[in-house]
UniProtKB/Swiss-Prot annotation:
Pathway noted in the entry: Purine metabolism; IMP biosynthesis via de novo pathway; 5-amino-1-(5-phospho-D-ribosyl)imidazole from N(2)-formyl-N(1)-(5-phospho-D-ribosyl)glycinamide: step 1/2
Binding site for Mg(2+) 2: 110, 266
Positions of disulphide bridges: none
Pfam families: AIRS, AIRS_C, FGAR-AT_linker
Residues annotated for ATP binding in this entry: 45, 84, 492, 529
Subunit structure: Monomer. Part of the FGAM synthase complex composed of 1 PurL, 1 PurQ and 2 PurS subunits.
Protein name: Phosphoribosylformylglycinamidine synthase subunit PurL
Cellular component aspect of the GO annotation: cytoplasm
HAMAP family reported in the protein's UniProt record: PurL_2
Keyword set includes NADP: no
GO molecular function: ATP binding; magnesium ion binding; phosphoribosylformylglycinamidine synthase activity
Length: 729
C-alpha cells in the first residue's frame, strides 16, 4: 500500500503498523477504508473515550445508558423515554441545508431504531457574528438560514414537532458553526429493541433507501480540521429524503410489533461499515456479507463505495432465521428496498464477498469494542492566567446598558428561527418555542408530562472549562425544574477543537470532569451523547461547547408551570443569592468586548434545593410562573418575561452596586407567588434565600432606575433579530 493512499485515509504510521499486526498482512483498499472509518475520531472516540468512562450512568430509572443507539429512562406508567443528541457540525458548515437536515434524520433513526415513536425534536445551534455588513457576517447569515431551513424541512416532513432549543452567536464560531440535534421518543418499557447481531446463521437484512455515492468519507471528514486546502467537501455531505425516512420509520414501527428480529441498527456515520461492525461487536459474533446484493442507486459501484457510503434513510437488521420473508414483506409494503445481504457467524470476523469472491476479511473486535484509545497530552491553556482577573473598564448607566443588552442576538426573540418549525404536530405540545425555559410535551397514555431543556454557555466554558460544563448540566436541569418537572437524566454533545492541541484536550478533560461532578451531585446521570472534535479552522478552535439536554417528568401534565407572567398583580420573587458575578457575562462582552474572569463554584445543595422548592411550590398551587435567571441577569430575564406575556412589571431590586441587575450569579430563579405566606414556609423548609422584588402589571417595565415603555422594548425584542438576519432578503 503506497504512502499517499494511507495518508489520504488519515491513517498515521503507528496505526498502519497496528493494522499490519491485526491482519498479518497488507490491507487492500477496501480494508484500509474500513479501518480509516472505524478508527476515525467520529466513530472510535479514540481521543475522548478515556474521559467519558467515568460518567455517572446509572439510577433506578435508567433502563439503558451510553453504548446503544440512544439512552432510555423509565418515565412511569409502563412508558420509557428514548433520547439522544448528536452533532452534524462539519457537514452543516459545508452545505448548511443538507448538513442540518441529515443531522435531524440521523438522530431520528437513532431513536426509532430502539422501538420508540419520536415525539419531539430540539436543537442547539452556534453561529459566528451575524451583525454588520462584513463578508463573514453575510456568510454566517447564509449558514443560519440554510441550517434552520434544513432542520425545519426534515422535522416538518416527518411529522415530528420541533419543540425547543437554543441559538447563540460568538466570533469563536466564525470558522466552525455547531449544529446539534436532539430527538426524544416514547416506547413501552418492555418493547425496547437493541443494536445487536447474534445467533449463528441468523440473516442480516438491508432495508431502506438505495445506496449511492453521497457522504463517502463523511466520518473521516468529520474527524479533521478545516483549512483552505480542504473546503471543497460538498460530496462528503449526505443528501436527505425525509419522506423516505417517514416510510422507514413507519415500517420499522410495524416490524417492532412482530417477533421477527434479534436486533436493528441505523446506518449513520461510515454507513454499512459502522452498522455491521457495531452490531457484531456488541454481540461478540462474526458476519458474512454479500456486497453485490446491496441495493444500489448508481451503476458501477464498488465494494469500497458500498461499505463507506453514508446515503441516508437506511437500516441493518438481524432477523430470526426463517422470518426473512416476513421482514422483507413489511418493507416492500412501505415501498422500501429490502434485501438479505448476509448472515451472522461465529468467526469473530467480518467477511465481505463480491459476486462470490472474498474481497475483505477483518477481525471485528479491534474495530468495535477494542478500537484504539489514545492518551493525548494535555496542557492548561496560557490564556486562563491572562483573563482570570476581570476588570470592568468603566461605569455605564443602567438604562444605556439595558437597551444595549436587549439588542444582543443572544437575547432577542428567535421567532425567525422557530416559526419555521412545526411545534404542535402530534398535538402533544404543552409549551412550545418562544416562551422561555423548558419545552414540555404530554404523555397521553399516562397523563404525565415530559420537560426538556438545552443549555450551554460557551463563554463560561472558555473562561472555566470544568465549572462551565458543570453549569450547563445544572442550568439545563434548573430549566426543567422551573416547569414543575423533576430532572432525571441528561444527554450531551461535547463540541471542542482540535484534540492534537494539548490545550484543547485539557479543556475537554476538564469539561468531562465538570459534567461528572454535576451529574453525580444533582443525580441526573448521562444516558447517551456524542463527541465532536476538530471544530477548528486554520488552527483556531471554537469555544468549548458541551451542550446538554436535561429531561424530566412532571406527574401531572395539567400542572405545567409557565415561564412568563400570567396576570397582573402577581408578586415577583427572586430566589437565590446575587453576588455581583460578571465572569464570562453578556454584560462585559456586549459593553466592553471582554471575555474573562473567574467562575465561582456551584453550590449543588443550593441548586438542588432550588429545584425541589419550585417543584413543591407548584404542587402546592402557590406559583403562577417560574423562570431561571440566566444570560443578562435579572434585568434581561424579567424583560423577556414581560415582553412575551405583554404584561409590565414594577420592580425594586436591592443590590450592592447598580449594575448587579445584570450580574450572572448562579442558582437563581424568578417566580410568581400567589400565596406569599405559604411560599415563605416552603422556602424556609428547603433553605432557599428569597426576596420579593416587585409585582406584575401595567404597560411599563420598571426595574430600579430603568423605566421603559413595554410596547417599545417589545418591538425591539420581537423584531430586531429578523432585521439583522434578513438584510440580504
Amino acid at each position: 500500500m503506497d504512502k499517499a493512499t494511507i495518508k489520504a485515509h488519515k491513517i498515521n504510521e503507528q496505526e498502519y503498523e497496528e493494522i499490519l499486526k491485526i491482519l498479518g498482512r497488507e490491507p487492500n483498499l477496501l480494508e484500509l477504508g474500513i479501518f480509516s472509518a472505524m478508527w476515525s475520531e467520529h466513530c472510535s472516540y479514540k481521543s475522548s473515550k478515556k474521559y467519558l468512562n467515568g460518567f455517572p450512568t446509572k439510577a433506578p430509572w435508567v433502563i439503558q445508558g451510553p453504548g446503544e443507539n440512544a439512552g432510555v429512562i423509565d418515565v412511569g406508567g409502563g412508558v420509557a423515554a428514548v433520547f439522544k443528541m448528536e452533532s452534524h457540525n462539519h457537514p452543516s458548515f459545508i452545505e448548511p441545508f443538507q448538513g442540518a437536515a441529515t443531522g435531524v434524520g440521523g438522530i431520528l433513526r437513532d431513536v426509532f431504531t430502539m422501538g420508540a415513536r419520536v415525539v419531539a425534536n430540539m436543537n442547539s445551534l452556534r453561529f459566528g457574528e451575524v451583525c454588520g455588513d462584513s463578508e463573514n457576517a453575510r456568510k454566517q447569515r447564509y449558514l443560519l438560514k440554510g441550517a434552520v431551513a434544513g432542520i425545519g424541512h426534515y422535522g416538518n416532513c416527518m411529522g415530528i414537532p420541533t419543540v425547543g432549543g437554543e441559538t447563540t452567536f460568538d466570533a469563536s464560531f466564525n470558522g466552525n458553526i455547531l449544529v446539534n440535534a436532539f430527538a426524544l421518543g416514547l416506547v413501552k418499557s418492555d418493547e425496547i429493541f437493541y443494536g445487536k447481531a447474534e445467533g449463528i446463521g441468523n440473516p442480516v437484512i438491508y432495508v431502506g433507501s438505495k445506496t449511492g455515492r453521497d457522504g463517502l468519507g463523511g466520518a473521516v471528514m468529520a474527524s479533521d480540521s478545516f483549512s483552505d486546502a480542504n473546503k471543497s467537501l460538498r460530496p462528503t455531505v449526505q443528501v436527505g429524503d425525509p419522506f423516505a425516512e417517514k416510510l422507514l420509520m413507519e415500517a420499522c414501527l410495524e416490524l417492532f410489533k412482530k417477533d421477527y428480529i434479534v436486533g436493528i441498527q441505523d446506518m449513520g456515520a461510515a454507513g454499512l461499515t459502522s452498522s455491521s461492525f457495531e452490531m457484531a461487536g456488541r454481540s461478540g459474533s462474526g458476519m458474512k456479507m454479500q456486497l453485490d446484493r446491496v441495493p444500489m442507486r448508481e451503476e458501477g459501484m464498488s465494494p469500497y463505495e458500498l461499505m463507506l457510503s453514508e446515503s441516508q434513510e437506511r437500516m441493518l437488521i438481524c432477523a430470526k432465521k426463517g422470518c426473512e420473508q416476513k421482514v422483507l414483506e413489511i418493507f416492500k409494503k412501505w415501498d422500501l428496498d429490502a434485501e438479505v445481504i448476509g448472515e451472522v457467524t461465529d468467526s469473530g470476523q467480518m467477511q465481505l464477498y463480491w459476486h462470490g469472491e472474498l474481497v475483505g476479511q477483518i477481525p471485528i473486535k479491534p474495530l468495535s469494542e477494542a478500537a484504539p484509545v489514545l492518551d493525548r497530552p494535555t496542557a492548561r491553556p496560557k490564556y486562563l492566567d491572562e483573563i482570570k482577573n476581570l476588570q470592568i473598564p468603566k461605569d455605564i448607566d443602567n438604562k444605556t446598558a439595558f437597551l444595549k443588552l436587549l439588542r444582543e442576538s443572544e437575547i432577542l426573540n428567535k421567532a425567525l428561527i422557530y416559526d419555521q418549525y412545526d411545534a404542535n404536530i402530534q398535538t402533544n405540545t404543552i409549551k412550545q418555542p418562544g416562551y422561555l425555559g423548558a419545552a414540555v410535551i404530554r404523555i397521553k397514555e399516562t397523563g404525565k408530562a415530559l420537560a426538556m431543556a438545552a443549555q450551554c454557555d460557551p463563554r463560561a466554558n472558555f473562561v472555566g472549562p470544568k465549572i462551565g460544563a458543570a453549569r450547563a448540566v445544572a442550568a439545563a436541569g434548573r430549566k426543567v425544574a422551573m416547569s414543575g418537572a423533576m430532572p432525571l437524566a441528561i444527554t450531551d454533545c461535547l463540541n471542542y477543537g482540535n484534540p492534537q492541541n494539548p490545550e484543547v484536550m485539557w479543556q475537554f478533560a476538564q469539561g468531562c470532569e465538570g459534567i461528572k461532578e454535576a451529574c453525580r451531585e444533582l443525580n441526573t446521570p448521562v444516558v447517551s451523547g456524542n463527541v465532536s472534535l476538530y471544530n477548528d479552522t486554520d488552527g483556531v478552535s471554537v469555544y468549548p461547547t458541551p451542550a446538554i439536554v436535561s429531561v424530566g417528568v412532571n406527574d401531572d401534565a395539567r400542572a405545567n408551570l409557565k415561564s412568563v407572567f400570567g396576570s397582573a398583580g402577581t408578586a415577583i420573587y427572586l430566589l437565590g443569592e446575587t453576588k455581583g458575578e460578571f465572569a464570562a457575562s453578556l454584560y462585559v462582552k456586549a459593553l466592553f468586548d471582554v471575555v474573562g474572569g473567574t467562575l465561582s463554584e456551584i453550590d449543588y445543595k443550593k441548586e438542588r434545593a432550588l429545584w425541589e422548592l419550585v417543584i413543591a411550590a407548584n404542587k402546592a398551587g402557590v406559583l403562577e410562573f417560574a423562570n431561571s435567571v440566566g444570560v443578562g441577569g435579572v434585568a434581561m430575564s424579567l424583560a423577556k418575561m414581560a415582553c412575551i406575556s405583554g404584561i409590565g412589571a414594577e420592580c425594586k431590586f436591592d443590590v450592592a452596586q447598580a449594575n448587579f441587575i445584570f450580574d450572572e450569579s448562579f442558582s437563581r430563579a424568578l417566580v410568581g407567588v400567589t400565596s406569599e405566606a405559604k411560599f415563605s414556609e416552603l422556602a424556609a423548609k428547603f433553605g432557599v434565600k428569597f426576596e420579593k422584588i416587585g409585582v406584575t402589571g401595567g404597560d411599563k417595565f420598571r426595574l430600579n432606575e430603568i423605566d421603559e415603555n413595554l410596547k417599545e422594548i417589545s418591538e425591539i425584542y420581537f423584531n430586531e433579530f429578523a432585521n439583522i438576519i434578513k438584510q440580504e432578503d
